[in-house]
Amino acid sequence: MRPAVAAALLLVAAAVAASPVSALYSAGSPVLQFNPNNFKSKVLNSNGVVLVEFFAPWCGHCQQLTPIWEKAAGVLKGVATVAALDADAHKELAQEYGIRGFPTIKVFVPGKPPVDYQGARDVKPIVEFALSQVKALLRDRLNGKTSAGSGGKKSGGSSEKTEPSASIELNSQNFDKLVTKSKDLWIVEFFAPWCGHCKKLAPEWKKAAKNLKGQVKLGHVDCDAEKSLMSKYKVEGFPTILVFGADKESPFPYQGARVASAIESFALEQLEANAAPPEVSELTGPDAMEEKCASAAICFVSFLPDILDSKAEGRNKYLELLLSVAEKFKKSPYSFVWTAAGKQADLEKQVGVGGYGYPAMVALNVKKGAYAPLRSAFQLDEITEFVKEAGRGGKGNLPLDGTPTIVQSEPWDGKDGEVIEEDEFSLEELMADNSPVNDEL
């Protein structure tokens, strides 16, 4: 009996050791447990907000988080999904999402790349963060920015197939103009039509391009048709994904997971890393108007007082204020420009500025031919709120009466203005009768 008992005890011990302390979460836990088999259907195709904890059973911090995570799951039941994934058991899936430490909490929202939860590991902040994501999702749906089922089942069989891709087709004729001479961040897939891995990537690439539209440009090159580009960028296998950042002459390969969420997360990280410092440009002519305002979603135009009224010190304070605002919105497709009072008379007339009331600001949408004036004080908080409101669609937008005429003007030299002194004259001289005297009778 004793050998049998000993053997049984060994089996039990082995079972306990093998059973993942895994089970940080039991079958009856309110925390759902995901794996590679159900991750896509439960997370990527979900219609709602999903919070996923990537954990390792042996991780002390993960064990401390377990009761907190379960309580948060209970509070959020029916509002948001709270789940966990054993990253130790499913290393490949964890690597796709760049998991390097435990626990890592990622929040998945339909139609957007996942974001890391960086807050305190306590029930209240976790729940509050989840609710903020839910509210943002609902707000987007109300505003028509995403459909109610954007992350779930396809609503129509053909619409998905016929929808044009947001990835731009690149070739030897347009590559330099669109990519290498551009200031934008580009991520380009070099593919071959017959390549199986490329076909597998295609729907993920299309999804990433759609979600990143307006932020990061994605393009694709058919290497069967574009051998010169393939050779120039030393493409030897398919698909090859190259990142064209600030240094367009030295693109580097993307080596992350070939899924939309990973591509999107990487692209947004690169966008932040490559973001140019914010600028507030002077509106000195038609070219400046075209460059700064024509392509921007919204162009915020400030009309500053004449240099004789504010002097250089005052004007610089206004420009510093505008730079602070631009910094807050540097990830948004906005531009900020300024002009001095009276320099762009037709523009002032069209937007109801001029004669008095400097400084002033308007939100200008050149494509729609509309504008909205700042009706509050020219101060940081008020301007910041004005920019946010304009980004949400604005209130009280007014139509432009045609295209404003922008005239060429000299840029400000950074100095105080010079008062032009007129020649002094004597009132007696002005009133004197200088007509010749006639002595004749």
Curated annotation (Swiss-Prot):
The record marks 60-61, 196-197 as: Contributes to redox potential value. This is Protein disulfide isomerase-like 2-3. Its main location: endoplasmic reticulum. It holds the Pfam family Thioredox_PDIA6_C. Keywords: Disulfide bond, Endoplasmic reticulum, Isomerase, Redox-active center, Repeat, Signal. The record marks 258 as: Lowers pKa of C-terminal Cys of second active site. It catalyses: Catalyzes the rearrangement of -S-S- bonds in proteins. It comes from Oryza sativa subsp. japonica. NCBIfam families: pdi_dom. Belongs to the protein disulfide isomerase family. Residues 1-18 form the signal peptide. The gene is PDIL2-3. It comes from the Eukaryota. One of its GO terms (biological process) is response to endoplasmic reticulum stress. It is an enzyme of class 5 (isomerase). SUPFAM superfamilies: Thioredoxin-like (SSF52833). The active site is at residues 59, 62, 195, 198. Residues 19-139, 159-276 form the Thioredoxin domain.
